[in-house]
Amino acid sequence: MDKSKINFNYQSRAVYSANPQTSRGRLFHETMNTLRSPFQRDRDRIIHSNAFRRLKHKTQVFIADESDHYRTRLTHSIEVSQIARTLARALYLDEDLAESIALVHDFGHTPFGHAGEDALNEAMAPYGGFDHNAQALRIVTKLEQRYANFDGLNLTWETLEGLVKHNGPLLGPYAKNKDIPIDILQYNAKQDLQLNCFAGLEAQCAAIADDIAYNAHDVDDGLRSQFLTLDQFEQVSLTAALLNDIKKEHPQLDQTRRGYTLVRRQIKTMVEDVIKQSQENLARVKPKSISDVHQAEQTIVTFSPTMAVYERELKDFLFKNLYYHDQVLNRRNAAKRIVQKLFECYYENPDVMPENWHNKTAHLTNQELARLIADFLSGMTDHYALREYQHLFDCTDNFI
Protein backbone atom coordinates (compact mmCIF):
# COMPACT_ATOMS: atom_id res chain seq x y z
CA MET A 1 0.00 0.00 0.00
CA ASP A 2 1.37 3.40 -1.00
CA LYS A 3 0.64 5.61 2.01
CA SER A 4 1.62 8.73 0.08
CA LYS A 5 -1.38 8.30 -2.21
CA ILE A 6 -3.97 8.10 0.57
CA ASN A 7 -6.11 11.24 0.45
CA PHE A 8 -6.89 12.83 3.82
CA ASN A 9 -7.87 16.10 2.08
CA TYR A 10 -5.35 18.07 4.16
CA GLN A 11 -4.79 20.65 1.43
CA SER A 12 -8.25 22.23 1.65
CA ARG A 13 -7.98 23.47 5.25
CA ALA A 14 -7.52 27.08 6.27
CA VAL A 15 -4.58 28.08 8.47
CA TYR A 16 -6.97 28.61 11.40
CA SER A 17 -8.57 25.16 11.18
CA ALA A 18 -7.65 22.17 13.30
CA ASN A 19 -4.99 20.06 11.61
CA PRO A 20 -4.95 16.30 12.32
CA GLN A 21 -1.27 16.16 11.39
CA THR A 22 -0.44 18.49 14.28
CA SER A 23 -3.08 17.25 16.73
CA ARG A 24 -2.23 17.60 20.41
CA GLY A 25 -2.81 13.88 20.62
CA ARG A 26 -4.53 11.63 23.13
CA LEU A 27 -4.17 11.20 26.88
CA PHE A 28 -2.86 7.67 26.25
CA HIS A 29 -0.40 7.63 23.35
CA GLU A 30 -1.33 5.63 20.27
CA THR A 31 0.51 5.19 17.00
CA MET A 32 -0.91 6.95 13.94
CA ASN A 33 -3.29 4.99 11.75
CA THR A 34 -2.29 4.69 8.09
CA LEU A 35 -5.84 4.78 6.74
CA ARG A 36 -7.61 7.30 8.95
CA SER A 37 -6.73 10.67 10.40
CA PRO A 38 -6.93 11.08 14.21
CA PHE A 39 -10.25 12.89 13.87
CA GLN A 40 -11.68 10.17 11.63
CA ARG A 41 -10.71 7.62 14.27
CA ASP A 42 -12.49 9.72 16.90
CA ARG A 43 -15.64 9.75 14.79
CA ASP A 44 -15.48 6.00 14.25
CA ARG A 45 -14.95 5.30 17.96
CA ILE A 46 -17.92 7.49 18.80
CA ILE A 47 -20.16 5.73 16.28
CA HIS A 48 -19.16 2.26 17.52
CA SER A 49 -19.69 3.09 21.20
CA ASN A 50 -22.53 1.84 23.39
CA ALA A 51 -23.44 5.42 24.27
CA PHE A 52 -24.04 6.26 20.61
CA ARG A 53 -26.38 3.32 20.13
CA ARG A 54 -28.36 4.26 23.23
CA LEU A 55 -29.20 7.62 21.65
CA LYS A 56 -31.63 5.74 19.40
CA HIS A 57 -34.12 5.45 22.25
CA LYS A 58 -33.52 8.79 24.00
CA THR A 59 -35.74 11.74 23.23
CA GLN A 60 -35.81 15.50 23.77
CA VAL A 61 -39.46 16.63 23.82
CA PHE A 62 -41.58 13.63 22.89
CA ILE A 63 -41.29 10.25 24.61
CA ALA A 64 -39.68 7.50 22.54
CA ASP A 65 -42.75 5.26 22.24
CA GLU A 66 -45.17 8.00 21.12
CA SER A 67 -44.32 7.75 17.42
CA ASP A 68 -41.73 6.10 15.22
CA HIS A 69 -41.20 9.38 13.38
CA TYR A 70 -40.38 11.83 16.16
CA ARG A 71 -36.71 12.77 16.50
CA THR A 72 -34.52 10.93 18.96
CA ARG A 73 -31.12 11.96 20.27
CA LEU A 74 -29.60 9.71 17.60
CA THR A 75 -31.42 11.22 14.62
CA HIS A 76 -30.81 14.68 16.05
CA SER A 77 -27.08 14.01 16.39
CA ILE A 78 -26.89 12.79 12.79
CA GLU A 79 -28.72 15.92 11.61
CA VAL A 80 -26.37 18.12 13.64
CA SER A 81 -23.34 16.35 12.17
CA GLN A 82 -24.62 16.88 8.62
CA ILE A 83 -25.08 20.61 9.20
CA ALA A 84 -21.74 20.88 11.02
CA ARG A 85 -19.93 19.22 8.10
CA THR A 86 -21.58 21.63 5.66
CA LEU A 87 -20.46 24.63 7.71
CA ALA A 88 -16.96 23.24 8.17
CA ARG A 89 -16.57 22.58 4.46
CA ALA A 90 -17.74 26.07 3.53
CA LEU A 91 -15.30 27.64 5.99
CA TYR A 92 -12.35 25.39 5.02
CA LEU A 93 -12.24 23.62 8.38
CA ASP A 94 -11.73 19.97 9.31
CA GLU A 95 -15.04 18.25 8.53
CA ASP A 96 -14.16 15.07 10.44
CA LEU A 97 -13.52 16.96 13.68
CA ALA A 98 -16.72 18.98 13.32
CA GLU A 99 -18.61 15.73 12.72
CA SER A 100 -17.03 14.01 15.73
CA ILE A 101 -17.98 16.81 18.10
CA ALA A 102 -21.51 16.92 16.68
CA LEU A 103 -21.98 13.16 17.09
CA VAL A 104 -20.71 13.08 20.68
CA HIS A 105 -22.30 16.26 22.01
CA ASP A 106 -25.48 14.55 23.32
CA PHE A 107 -23.83 11.51 24.96
CA GLY A 108 -24.46 12.76 28.49
CA HIS A 109 -28.20 13.33 28.21
CA THR A 110 -30.62 11.45 30.42
CA PRO A 111 -33.74 9.58 29.32
CA PHE A 112 -36.82 11.75 28.72
CA GLY A 113 -34.92 14.80 27.51
CA HIS A 114 -34.57 17.92 29.62
CA ALA A 115 -37.26 16.70 32.03
CA GLY A 116 -35.05 13.76 32.96
CA GLU A 117 -32.00 15.98 33.34
CA ASP A 118 -33.86 18.43 35.57
CA ALA A 119 -35.04 15.58 37.79
CA LEU A 120 -31.58 14.01 38.04
CA ASN A 121 -29.96 17.38 38.71
CA GLU A 122 -32.42 17.96 41.57
CA ALA A 123 -31.74 14.50 43.01
CA MET A 124 -27.98 15.07 42.71
CA ALA A 125 -28.06 18.59 44.19
CA PRO A 126 -26.57 17.46 47.55
CA TYR A 127 -23.82 15.61 45.67
CA GLY A 128 -22.60 18.18 43.17
CA GLY A 129 -25.53 18.22 40.73
CA PHE A 130 -25.76 16.74 37.26
CA ASP A 131 -24.59 18.35 34.01
CA HIS A 132 -24.97 16.59 30.66
CA ASN A 133 -21.74 18.02 29.21
CA ALA A 134 -19.76 16.78 32.20
CA GLN A 135 -21.52 13.42 31.92
CA ALA A 136 -20.57 13.18 28.24
CA LEU A 137 -16.95 13.73 29.26
CA ARG A 138 -17.25 10.99 31.91
CA ILE A 139 -18.60 8.61 29.28
CA VAL A 140 -15.84 9.15 26.73
CA THR A 141 -13.00 9.27 29.28
CA LYS A 142 -14.12 6.65 31.80
CA LEU A 143 -17.45 4.84 31.46
CA GLU A 144 -17.02 3.37 27.97
CA GLN A 145 -14.79 0.36 28.61
CA ARG A 146 -13.89 -1.22 25.29
CA TYR A 147 -10.11 -1.06 25.04
CA ALA A 148 -7.33 -3.09 26.61
CA ASN A 149 -5.06 -0.24 27.68
CA PHE A 150 -7.40 2.49 28.89
CA ASP A 151 -10.92 3.36 30.02
CA GLY A 152 -13.02 5.58 27.80
CA LEU A 153 -12.49 6.15 24.09
CA ASN A 154 -9.16 8.01 24.35
CA LEU A 155 -10.34 10.72 21.96
CA THR A 156 -8.03 13.46 20.72
CA TRP A 157 -7.51 16.68 22.65
CA GLU A 158 -9.35 18.59 19.93
CA THR A 159 -12.51 16.49 20.18
CA LEU A 160 -12.56 16.62 23.98
CA GLU A 161 -11.93 20.36 23.96
CA GLY A 162 -14.78 20.82 21.51
CA LEU A 163 -17.10 18.64 23.57
CA VAL A 164 -16.46 20.56 26.77
CA LYS A 165 -16.29 24.09 25.35
CA HIS A 166 -18.53 24.08 22.26
CA ASN A 167 -20.79 26.63 23.97
CA GLY A 168 -17.88 28.87 24.97
CA PRO A 169 -15.13 29.17 27.62
CA LEU A 170 -15.78 27.77 31.09
CA LEU A 171 -13.34 30.08 32.87
CA GLY A 172 -12.43 33.74 32.52
CA PRO A 173 -14.40 36.84 31.54
CA TYR A 174 -16.27 35.15 28.69
CA ALA A 175 -17.57 32.20 30.70
CA LYS A 176 -21.37 32.03 30.71
CA ASN A 177 -21.61 29.95 33.89
CA LYS A 178 -19.18 30.39 36.76
CA ASP A 179 -19.90 26.93 38.23
CA ILE A 180 -17.78 24.26 36.55
CA PRO A 181 -18.75 20.61 37.16
CA ILE A 182 -16.18 18.75 39.23
CA ASP A 183 -15.76 16.04 36.58
CA ILE A 184 -14.57 18.60 34.05
CA LEU A 185 -12.13 20.13 36.54
CA GLN A 186 -10.77 16.73 37.52
CA TYR A 187 -10.19 15.68 33.94
CA ASN A 188 -8.70 19.07 33.10
CA ALA A 189 -6.05 18.43 35.75
CA LYS A 190 -4.91 15.42 33.69
CA GLN A 191 -5.13 17.02 30.26
CA ASP A 192 -5.37 20.81 30.05
CA LEU A 193 -8.33 21.68 27.82
CA GLN A 194 -7.70 25.43 28.16
CA LEU A 195 -11.03 26.11 29.82
CA ASN A 196 -10.48 29.88 29.69
CA CYS A 197 -10.25 29.94 25.87
CA PHE A 198 -12.79 29.70 23.09
CA ALA A 199 -13.09 26.35 21.36
CA GLY A 200 -11.85 25.78 17.83
CA LEU A 201 -14.01 26.68 14.87
CA GLU A 202 -15.04 23.08 14.27
CA ALA A 203 -16.62 22.99 17.73
CA GLN A 204 -18.28 26.32 17.06
CA CYS A 205 -19.75 24.84 13.87
CA ALA A 206 -21.11 21.89 15.86
CA ALA A 207 -22.63 24.20 18.48
CA ILE A 208 -24.54 26.39 16.04
CA ALA A 209 -25.49 23.34 13.95
CA ASP A 210 -27.13 22.02 17.13
CA ASP A 211 -29.24 25.18 17.36
CA ILE A 212 -30.21 25.02 13.69
CA ALA A 213 -31.17 21.34 13.84
CA TYR A 214 -32.98 21.72 17.16
CA ASN A 215 -35.17 24.55 15.88
CA ALA A 216 -35.94 22.73 12.64
CA HIS A 217 -36.88 19.40 14.14
CA ASP A 218 -39.03 20.99 16.82
CA VAL A 219 -40.98 22.77 14.09
CA ASP A 220 -41.29 19.46 12.22
CA ASP A 221 -42.24 17.40 15.29
CA GLY A 222 -44.59 20.11 16.51
CA LEU A 223 -46.48 20.03 13.22
CA ARG A 224 -46.45 16.22 13.11
CA SER A 225 -47.90 16.01 16.62
CA GLN A 226 -50.55 18.59 15.69
CA PHE A 227 -49.61 20.56 18.79
CA LEU A 228 -48.65 23.32 16.33
CA THR A 229 -50.19 24.46 13.04
CA LEU A 230 -48.75 26.26 10.03
CA ASP A 231 -51.10 29.16 10.76
CA GLN A 232 -49.37 29.67 14.10
CA PHE A 233 -46.01 30.03 12.35
CA GLU A 234 -47.43 33.05 10.54
CA GLN A 235 -46.85 34.82 13.88
CA VAL A 236 -43.06 34.27 13.75
CA SER A 237 -40.98 36.57 11.54
CA LEU A 238 -38.67 33.99 9.97
CA THR A 239 -41.21 31.24 9.36
CA ALA A 240 -43.84 33.74 8.20
CA ALA A 241 -41.50 35.03 5.49
CA LEU A 242 -40.60 31.49 4.41
CA LEU A 243 -44.24 30.41 4.31
CA ASN A 244 -45.13 33.45 2.23
CA ASP A 245 -42.49 32.48 -0.35
CA ILE A 246 -43.68 28.87 -0.37
CA LYS A 247 -47.30 29.92 -0.95
CA LYS A 248 -46.26 32.11 -3.88
CA GLU A 249 -44.20 29.36 -5.49
CA HIS A 250 -46.54 26.46 -4.72
CA PRO A 251 -50.06 27.82 -4.11
CA GLN A 252 -51.69 24.37 -4.36
CA LEU A 253 -49.26 22.55 -2.07
CA ASP A 254 -50.94 20.49 0.65
CA GLN A 255 -50.31 21.26 4.31
CA THR A 256 -48.02 18.30 4.96
CA ARG A 257 -45.66 19.06 2.08
CA ARG A 258 -45.79 22.75 2.95
CA GLY A 259 -44.58 21.89 6.45
CA TYR A 260 -41.70 19.79 5.13
CA THR A 261 -40.75 22.57 2.71
CA LEU A 262 -40.79 25.08 5.56
CA VAL A 263 -38.38 22.98 7.61
CA ARG A 264 -35.96 22.51 4.70
CA ARG A 265 -35.94 26.21 3.86
CA GLN A 266 -35.53 27.15 7.50
CA ILE A 267 -32.37 25.03 7.70
CA LYS A 268 -31.05 26.37 4.38
CA THR A 269 -31.70 29.98 5.37
CA MET A 270 -29.97 29.62 8.72
CA VAL A 271 -26.99 27.72 7.30
CA GLU A 272 -26.43 30.32 4.58
CA ASP A 273 -26.70 33.11 7.15
CA VAL A 274 -24.10 31.47 9.42
CA ILE A 275 -21.67 30.97 6.54
CA LYS A 276 -21.97 34.59 5.37
CA GLN A 277 -21.68 36.05 8.88
CA SER A 278 -18.79 33.76 9.83
CA GLN A 279 -16.90 34.74 6.67
CA GLU A 280 -17.33 38.38 7.68
CA ASN A 281 -16.21 37.61 11.23
CA LEU A 282 -13.11 35.81 9.95
CA ALA A 283 -12.27 38.73 7.68
CA ARG A 284 -12.51 41.09 10.65
CA VAL A 285 -10.71 38.95 13.27
CA LYS A 286 -8.08 37.73 10.76
CA PRO A 287 -6.91 34.62 12.67
CA LYS A 288 -3.59 33.28 11.38
CA SER A 289 -3.68 30.07 13.39
CA ILE A 290 -5.93 27.96 15.56
CA SER A 291 -4.28 29.65 18.54
CA ASP A 292 -5.66 32.97 17.33
CA VAL A 293 -9.14 31.40 17.32
CA HIS A 294 -8.67 30.15 20.89
CA GLN A 295 -7.51 33.58 22.04
CA ALA A 296 -10.19 35.55 20.19
CA GLU A 297 -12.46 37.57 22.41
CA GLN A 298 -15.60 36.33 20.67
CA THR A 299 -17.31 33.38 19.07
CA ILE A 300 -16.54 33.52 15.34
CA VAL A 301 -19.10 31.09 13.90
CA THR A 302 -22.36 32.94 14.55
CA PHE A 303 -25.69 34.03 13.19
CA SER A 304 -25.94 37.54 11.80
CA PRO A 305 -27.44 40.05 14.27
CA THR A 306 -30.73 39.97 12.32
CA MET A 307 -30.90 36.17 12.21
CA ALA A 308 -30.00 36.00 15.91
CA VAL A 309 -33.13 38.05 16.66
CA TYR A 310 -35.25 35.83 14.40
CA GLU A 311 -33.82 32.68 15.96
CA ARG A 312 -34.53 33.96 19.48
CA GLU A 313 -38.10 34.79 18.47
CA LEU A 314 -38.58 31.28 17.05
CA LYS A 315 -37.17 29.69 20.20
CA ASP A 316 -39.47 31.77 22.39
CA PHE A 317 -42.44 30.73 20.25
CA LEU A 318 -41.52 27.05 20.53
CA PHE A 319 -41.09 27.27 24.29
CA LYS A 320 -44.46 28.91 24.74
CA ASN A 321 -46.45 26.82 22.29
CA LEU A 322 -44.70 23.43 22.18
CA TYR A 323 -42.57 22.83 25.27
CA TYR A 324 -45.28 24.28 27.52
CA HIS A 325 -48.18 22.65 25.72
CA ASP A 326 -50.43 20.95 28.29
CA GLN A 327 -49.85 17.45 26.91
CA VAL A 328 -46.08 17.96 26.75
CA LEU A 329 -46.06 19.26 30.34
CA ASN A 330 -48.05 16.23 31.51
CA ARG A 331 -45.51 13.90 29.93
CA ARG A 332 -42.67 16.00 31.32
CA ASN A 333 -44.04 15.74 34.85
CA ALA A 334 -44.50 11.98 34.49
CA ALA A 335 -40.93 11.65 33.21
CA LYS A 336 -39.54 13.68 36.11
CA ARG A 337 -41.44 11.51 38.56
CA ILE A 338 -39.99 8.34 37.05
CA VAL A 339 -36.39 9.59 37.25
CA GLN A 340 -36.85 10.90 40.80
CA LYS A 341 -38.41 7.65 42.00
CA LEU A 342 -35.73 5.51 40.36
CA PHE A 343 -32.96 7.56 41.95
CA GLU A 344 -34.56 7.29 45.39
CA CYS A 345 -35.09 3.56 44.99
CA TYR A 346 -31.50 2.86 43.89
CA TYR A 347 -30.05 5.08 46.61
CA GLU A 348 -32.04 3.34 49.37
CA ASN A 349 -31.67 -0.15 47.88
CA PRO A 350 -28.56 -0.38 45.64
CA ASP A 351 -29.03 -4.15 45.37
CA VAL A 352 -32.00 -3.70 43.02
CA MET A 353 -29.67 -2.36 40.35
CA PRO A 354 -28.34 -4.90 37.83
CA GLU A 355 -25.52 -7.05 39.18
CA ASN A 356 -22.76 -5.34 37.21
CA TRP A 357 -23.78 -2.07 38.87
CA HIS A 358 -24.65 -3.07 42.44
CA ASN A 359 -21.38 -5.03 42.64
CA LYS A 360 -19.62 -1.66 42.51
CA THR A 361 -21.51 -0.19 45.48
CA ALA A 362 -19.63 -1.83 48.35
CA HIS A 363 -17.68 0.60 50.56
CA LEU A 364 -18.78 3.68 48.60
CA THR A 365 -19.40 6.98 50.33
CA ASN A 366 -22.84 8.56 49.91
CA GLN A 367 -21.32 10.94 47.36
CA GLU A 368 -19.76 8.10 45.36
CA LEU A 369 -22.96 6.05 45.48
CA ALA A 370 -25.02 8.97 44.21
CA ARG A 371 -22.60 9.52 41.33
CA LEU A 372 -22.69 5.83 40.43
CA ILE A 373 -26.49 5.94 40.34
CA ALA A 374 -26.34 9.06 38.16
CA ASP A 375 -24.06 7.19 35.75
CA PHE A 376 -26.52 4.30 35.62
CA LEU A 377 -29.66 6.43 35.35
CA SER A 378 -28.33 8.89 32.78
CA GLY A 379 -27.26 6.02 30.55
CA MET A 380 -30.78 4.60 30.40
CA THR A 381 -32.95 4.91 27.32
CA ASP A 382 -36.55 6.07 27.65
CA HIS A 383 -37.71 2.48 27.14
CA TYR A 384 -35.37 1.03 29.76
CA ALA A 385 -36.20 3.66 32.38
CA LEU A 386 -39.92 3.13 31.89
CA ARG A 387 -39.55 -0.67 32.16
CA GLU A 388 -37.45 -0.33 35.31
CA TYR A 389 -40.02 1.98 36.87
CA GLN A 390 -42.90 -0.35 36.01
CA HIS A 391 -40.97 -3.35 37.37
CA LEU A 392 -39.76 -1.77 40.61
CA PHE A 393 -43.02 -0.03 41.46
CA ASP A 394 -45.38 -2.63 40.01
CA CYS A 395 -47.29 -0.14 37.89
CA THR A 396 -48.16 0.47 34.27
CA ASP A 397 -47.54 4.22 34.02
CA ASN A 398 -47.21 4.88 30.28
CA PHE A 399 -47.47 8.68 30.16
CA ILE A 400 -51.11 8.59 29.11
Curated annotation (Swiss-Prot):
Gene Ontology biological-process annotations: dGTP catabolic process
Annotated coiled-coil segments of the chain: none
Any single Pfam family the record assigns to this protein: HD
Family statement: Belongs to the dGTPase family. Type 2 subfamily.
InterPro entries in UniProt: dGTPase, dGTPase-like, dNTPase_2, HD/PDEase_dom, HD_domain, PHydrolase_assoc_dom
PANTHER family: DEOXYGUANOSINETRIPHOSPHATE TRIPHOSPHOHYDROLASE-LIKE PROTEIN (PTHR11373:SF43), DEOXYNUCLEOSIDE TRIPHOSPHATE TRIPHOSPHOHYDROLASE (PTHR11373)
Protein name: Deoxyguanosinetriphosphate triphosphohydrolase-like protein
SMART domains hit by this protein: HDc
Keywords annotated in UniProt: Hydrolase
Disulfide-linked positions: none
PROSITE patterns registered for this protein in UniProt: HD (PS51831)
Domain HD per the UniProt entry, residue ranges: 73-215
Organism per entry: Bartonella henselae (strain ATCC 49882 / DSM 28221 / CCUG 30454 / Houston 1) (Rochalimaea henselae)
Gene3D superfamilies recorded: Hypothetical protein af1432 (1.10.3210.10)
GO molecular function, a single term: dGTPase activity
Phylogenetic placement of the source organism: Bacteria, Pseudomonadati, Pseudomonadota, Alphaproteobacteria, Hyphomicrobiales
